[in-house]
């Protein structure tokens, strides 16, 4: 079937801000699909509220709306742009849910707009738990015994009939939101209440728990003519019971017999045909070990996290092909871009093994429960490729950037064999390392399998790795032993650790005496049956090299930013991709190194060459030895890339742009203080310390409050405000849980207004696209603050000082490329608090809203061009004639036990944008995009720390004027009443009813404003109240500045008045 020529203008719905369960994979899929549609001459209209994405760049779609992802806003866009079709399958659950609301309300029919890529019936059959169950029964596909419920008592009745444990799966939710495994009635009531609240249709599936069965996934494609293929099948190392996004996943499956593989493949093709899917689809199965019994767990009728993994694992561009199918093409009409010779109807074949390991945020949320269940907790993931499973696992583990280089991780020296046996029962992020320790202690693979239900094949492979550790410790390091260890991807540093040699000795022995070098193989979709046209490589130690490293033009190495995590998100991938594109245009051969399967940077056609490798010195050196690049770019890949600077210089690779010494000078307290003194720039007083005692002395000399933080970190990791000696002791203990190579900084904390700039510098001139102002006062991490462009409340004098200081600092640090500076404005004085001579998380946002492509300009500066010649002027750019507000988005509901109080350590996972002609409308849009929906009941809770009580009076007065009923803790209520604001006093957690907890559990409250005292004590009432508000779905604000901003937007804007701005036309 050729293309459907009636499709001329398509609205693509994006996935919105990054939250746990919905990360960069949808930017990758959406970008690929928009490019695929434009290739076919289709006009593409895009709506997505996330400014950090590549897909919201003005040249990816024809019209780009960075607007809140709500049904009402999408309706407005359809009425304005009049697309003939809507493609909702590339924006994850958010896009599917909006499409269903527009279809069910009759809006799409009224406007003559068609859904393409899927139908509402297809979405319903896959997403509605009752429809799905009925469809599976109709075609004879087995599901676990289950019932669909819309009330908690119905769930309890079913569970008591079939017995606990049971699994709760809400309909139309993402990343297992609201789901879980309940071991008893109390847990069931808790999980099911939450699940029904989060489900778009108030529906949950309660099913018999089959935890312990193998979890298998099939990624399938089907076209409109009914042709189907399986792109990839994947096996979760973790059995059923852990969300697939939190599981270690292996592709292709390793433990299935051919009969099992074919049985599930046939089932997947039957299901996709019955549900009538056109495009990509993911089917998840539970397979009972040692039998042919299986159950269908669920079907995702859209591009998903698993499709991104399958795409990168096989080289098959699922999103691109899905977009072509949506236009009417059949699989045999779509060429395979990797081989250039085959078509999309050829099933990929793999002659290597791929391992994905999730990246969890437990280093940021040390109080959060680490237990893994059916509700996802990972923020990102890493992928590795090798010719064997052991090698792929070892590569994936070191890609996580947690100082883990082998299976020998974690201190178990104080644990007895019995303790280790107990730890095997814990299902958390450390389980594979506990398995390795259990093997070392002589616990049999059979017993480990019995406890964990992880397949013996995987346990045996981990045993092979622990056996190699033993051999390296006990045997002489012969060439044969070294080669065997390298084939399992043991890094030189681990071989050195076990063999008692130094790293340099091992490296010299391997490279010079034994001549053992990494070889690179191609990912080609067809197990080398046809030659690949696109250069996409992975390393191994047991084969011929397949890379053509001949030099035709200058080569530049672009280092990516690794897995998505809090503090280092999709923004840095955005910067890496734009730097790569810019350098390619400047005539360089570009080489990307990265290991994140969700991102645009690891797509096969972004750079001239892609190396899917861990970002460690040894792995990068293997590439450098082969490619001999003329230079490397580290300033676009976040802290991951910056940390490789020293290693690259040792390899003889020049760092393009700002030199390593100047990056160090910005991080080194003493060197940086000298620069500030020379430039006559003030900063808050501070000291460097190494021990807790030194920190307490420094804090007392500076005077409380102080800021305590490690140096060389991203996202404010480990940063806290201390108000007394006990706080300093607690924070130092937490910081020192990780070995600190650098001193710890103690700074005087100033309660001023925080202002931020990103600038481009060529060594002489600077260009500042705009000045951004934070709504929250200093002390809340810039990534968690609401950011406003252009700054609204700074004077011209302060603005001039900021530009002057930026120019002086950029010149003193000899910045070539990007620099990010954070200032505090306190009593009209400007202080510098932080300087980062690299890209920052605000770069995509400021680029889009000012229409100044600063990554591209910085890349040109890095290559020697002058800013004055690039057509955007120098100094501070002219202000835009609209306001853009970047709003942080959090994923607290997925992390039970995490404190949501904001402070200097970053906690947000994503962001959205509000853009409008007026400040009030932009602010309202930003809150709307972040999912802060108010009001339903017009009832709120106000409880603030003593220091905030007087300021809380005006907040209470404004809420009262909006018609809110205020409940307040006794001390807060007393201050409000004394100042003429009526409030109902209530107890916090204990005491006479109704307490604050009772009010929250009664689902009558719209909003909680609770400003926390310092510290991480989980037993404090404030902590309990903040957690309960998140778990009952109530918006909770922990800063009065945020509360005032919300009030401003509520006082000034009604929903019907929202305007739309196409940023491609700015």
UniProtKB/Swiss-Prot annotation:
ATP 1 binds at residues 129, 169, 175-176, 208, 210, 215, 241-243, 284, 298. It is an enzyme of class 6 (ligase). SUPFAM superfamilies: Carbamoyl phosphate synthetase, large subunit connection domain, Glutathione synthetase ATP-binding domain-like, Methylglyoxal synthase-like, PreATP-grasp domain. Residues 548-931 are annotated as: Carbamoyl phosphate synthetic domain. Mn(2+) 3 binds at residues 822, 834. Residues 133-327, 673-863 form the ATP-grasp domain. Residues 402-547 are annotated as: Oligomerization domain. It comes from Lachnoclostridium phytofermentans (strain ATCC 700394 / DSM 18823 / ISDg). Its EC number is 6.3.4.16, 6.3.5.5. Signal peptide: none annotated. Mg(2+) 1 binds at residues 284, 298. Its cofactor is Mg(2+); Mn(2+). Mg(2+) 4 binds at residues 834, 836. Transmembrane segments: none annotated. Composed of two chains; the small (or glutamine) chain promotes the hydrolysis of glutamine to ammonia, which is used by the large (or ammonia) chain to synthesize carbamoyl phosphate. Tetramer of heterodimers (alpha,beta)4. Keywords: Amino-acid biosynthesis, Arginine biosynthesis, ATP-binding, Ligase, Magnesium, Manganese, Metal-binding, Nucleotide-binding, Pyrimidine biosynthesis, Repeat. ATP 2 binds at residues 709, 748, 750, 754, 779-782, 822, 834. Mg(2+) 2 binds at residues 298, 300. Mn(2+) 2 binds at residues 298, 300. It catalyses: hydrogencarbonate + L-glutamine + 2 ATP + H2O = carbamoyl phosphate + L-glutamate + 2 ADP + phosphate + 2 H(+). Binds 4 Mg(2+) or Mn(2+) ions per subunit. Large subunit of the glutamine-dependent carbamoyl phosphate synthetase (CPSase). CPSase catalyzes the formation of carbamoyl phosphate from the ammonia moiety of glutamine, carbonate, and phosphate donated by ATP, constituting the first step of 2 biosynthetic pathways, one leading to arginine and/or urea and the other to pyrimidine nucleotides. Residues 932-1066 are annotated as: Allosteric domain. Mn(2+) 4 binds at residues 834, 836. This is Carbamoyl phosphate synthase large chain. Mn(2+) 1 binds at residues 284, 298. Pathway: Amino-acid biosynthesis; L-arginine biosynthesis; carbamoyl phosphate from bicarbonate: step 1/1; Pyrimidine metabolism; UMP biosynthesis via de novo pathway; (S)-dihydroorotate from bicarbonate: step 1/3.
